Regions:
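Extracytosolic ligand-binding ectodomains
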Residues: 2-14, 24-377
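N-terminal signal peptide c-region/cleavage motif recognized by signal peptidases
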Residues: 19-21
Length: 377
């Protein structure tokens, strides 16, 4: 009896020792996600969250070893509501809790003020915020993983002038840092190309009724209307353009490439909406096809606009940790500045300000409710 007790005790002690050893050889790396997990842009926030989640699952399956320890990646998600005040609070929460890698924010108006907090706390930020100001603040460990407004806006102006062959354009923006910045770049390039901006109207990122500003715009007879804003506004805007008999095309940035556009706008978006998708043509690409299939199997739906980019950047970070032999954001960031990464959505290489070098743009429209690529820049 005494022998059995001693034997059981020794076995239990050995098991605890093994467990303790396993824990000692494991290092937790938290990846934060700041995005709109409530409100009209929830669909985008959830998609981005899924991209991060899938990458974390893939990285954990690889059992990356750094400094003799197996890295265990964990996702920590917070709802910034696409609101600057909420986003700054999320940033402070992440910094205070020791999160040193953050994916997001999604909205430029959140990214601009939150980046200061992240930089002060030594946290790496990887954002899809496209306003040029984001990478002009001098933060050393901030990465913009898609093209900026400068490229998206100017490319859409070039498409309007050279492909659609229009002469008169109207501009509407939602007064957000993203929408206004993108519209400014479009208008500036349009004028350089000899197009006439016949009118500029303003709305908000909460509006759904655009009849008044569209009526004003209709009187000026633009051939295209450029909208700087998000899909939850662009879709009803397309519907109301149709109701008013406005025959102009509706142009915009990558947010208008979302599958939410045909869901919310119906057939009003078909061959009317043209958007600047911040990715590459992936038709026929085996890697992109495999990713889409894996994403759909895991989450029951196809990825939206940015989910694949979030996935790529988290995988990029994981590889950089492995290759640099460190989980220190400064060392990992330095490696990412020096070495390009080939992901699902192309190559990720960054300049000294954190802008993605040669970030691709694909102009797309919708046919039968599905996105159709037209041209790449």
């Amino acid at each position: 009896m005494q022998y059995n007790f001693v034997k059981s005790t020794l076995v239990a002690a050995a098991a605890l020792a093994c467990a303790a050893g396993a824990l000692a050889q494991e290092q937790v790396v938290k990846i934060g996600h700041s995005g709109p997990l409530s409100g009209p842009n929830t669909f985008a926030g959830r998609d981005n969250d899924n991209g991060v989640r899938l990458a974390i699952e893939d990285l954990n399956a690889r059992k990356i070893n750094v400094g003799g320890k197996t890295l265990k990646f964990e996702l920590v998600s917070e709802d910034d509501q696409c609101d600057a005040k909420a986003g700054v609070a999320v940033a402070q929460k992440f910094v205070d809790s020791g999160v040193r890698y953050v994916m997001g924010p999604y909205c430029s108006g959140v990214t601009i003020p939150a980046s200061r907090v992240y930089d002060g706390g030594g946290t790496m930020v990887s954002t899809v915020g496209t306003n040029p100001k984001i990478t002009q603040a001098g933060y050393k460990n901030l990465f913009r993983i898609v093209a900026s407004d400068e490229k998206a806006g100017s490319n859409m102006a070039a498409y309007a002038a050279n492909v659609l062959k229009v002469k008169k354009v109207g501009v509407i923006d939602d007064r957000t840092a993203f929408g206004q910045g993108l519209s400014d770049e479009f208008a500036k390039e349009a004028q350089k190309l000899g197009l006439t901006v016949v009118g500029r109207e303003f709305t908000t990122d909460k509006a759904t009724d655009f009849m008044a500003i569209l009526t004003n715009m209709k009187a000026k007879q633009p051939e295209v209307i450029f909208f700087g804003g998000y899909a939850p506004q662009a879709a009803p805007m397309a519907r109301q353009m149709k109701q008013l008999g406005i025959n102009a095309k509706l142009l915009g940035g990558d947010t208008l490439c979302s599958p939410e556009m045909p869901k919310l706008g119906g057939d009003a978006v078909n061959n009317v909406v043209y958007c600047a998708y911040a990715g590459m043509l992936t038709d026929g690409d085996a890697g992109a096809k495999a990713f889409q299939e894996k994403f759909k199997k895991r989450f029951g739906q196809n990825p939206d606009v940015y989910g694949p980019f979030y996935y790529d950047q988290v995988m990029n970070i994981g590889e950089a940790m492995q290759k640099s032999g460190s989980t220190d954001p400064v060392k990992v960031g330095a490696y990412m500045h020096q070495q390009a990464y080939k992901g699902v959505m192309g190559e990720y290489a960054y300049d000294d300000k954190g802008n993605r070098v040669k970030a691709p743009i694909v102009v797309m429209t919708f046919e039968g409710g599905k996105a159709k690529p037209l041209a790449s820049y």
